[in-house]
Amino acid sequence: APSHFAVRRPDLVRKCGQLWFDPGEPAVHDQAIAVMRDVVRRYDVDAVHIDDFFYPYPDTCTSFPDSATYRRYQQGGGALSLGDWRRDNVNRFVERMYRAVHEERATARVGISPFGIWRPGNPAGITGLDAFGTIYADSRRWLQSGWVDYFAPQLYWSIASSGQSFPALLGWWAQQNTMRRHLWPGLASYRIGTDPGPFSAAEIPSQVALVREAAATSGGATGSILYNATSVRTNRLGFATALAGGLYAGGAIPPATTWLDGTAPAALALTVVPSGSSLQVTTSASGDAWWWLLRWRVNGAWRQRLVPSTQRTVDIAASGVDGVVVNAVDRVGNASADAVWRP
């Protein structure tokens, strides 16, 4: 379209396999940040997420045509090598994006899902693409600088993989998480039953279990992300059913992003009224609540449900219920004190 930024500013576009905006051009940064600000300002988004594309991957572009941009940088007194300059372009954009999003909305989270290997040999025995040196993504720096609220390295390999060990990479990223940001690795559900190297139906549930074990370690993962949605919707080899009936059987509150807002919402008022074979659970309104967490104990076993704050009443089966607890949950995951009912 004539209004497209690439049409209006062809001087910023580089062709290499596809069309790319040159990360070395300040106007490219300005445009991308302006678009993100506009989206966050006008739409009720929970987060801004960017994927693993920075400079092109070498399988699509072997020599990015930015020599004129780099020469202009050098003529202006710049002394960084080409690789360091490219990484600096990406680093400055990531930092600026993080600050800009929060200037527009303090509770909007910023996340990145980089290639799962920072550099080969980190940790020892890891082989594969050097994202630091080929797409100029110094993803460890973004995590350790606190320029993300959640970090989702694409750990798209199996537990048994030798050169790209899922457990080894998971543990290594936890060690790098010195700012204690949310570490939510990406899991390759798209590989279940498909080439290359098809996963079994048990692979993803096993990885989820490892992630949960890692949550107990310092800086460890507190969740995971399945890629992609199609594999979940089509329930490849029944893996989604297995998760729903097992590891994902109960709802969960997303971990609180306390560095954005550490104040818990006010406790809810709770009313529980018997109604035939059901109990009608009603909570008060709370201006800070985005969700409310409903937990109830049936014959000694807890069940739970996460309910939108716009819904004030939920009916549960009364049989065997010996306690009900509700909490308000705000937009960044802070939970209020318990409101408790006992029969």
Feature names for model-found ranges:
Residues 304-310:
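Short beta-strand segments within Ig-like beta-sandwich modules, predominantly Fibronectin type-III
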Residues 71-125, 129-195:
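Glycoside hydrolase catalytic-domain groove-lining segments
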Residues 1-42, 134:
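Active-site-adjacent "subsite" loops/lids of carbohydrate-active enzymes
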Residues 284-299, 321:
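Solvent-exposed loop/turn segments flanking beta-strands in beta-repeat/beta-sandwich domains
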Residues 139-140, 144-162, 173-260:
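Substrate-binding cleft of secreted/luminal carbohydrate-active enzymes
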Residues 316-335:
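Beta-strand-rich modules
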Residues 1-15, 52-77, 123-130:
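Aromatic- and acidic-residue-enriched segments that line the glycan-binding/catalytic groove
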Residues 243, 248-287, 334-343:
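Pro/Thr/Ser/Gly-rich low-complexity, intrinsically disordered linker/stalk tracts
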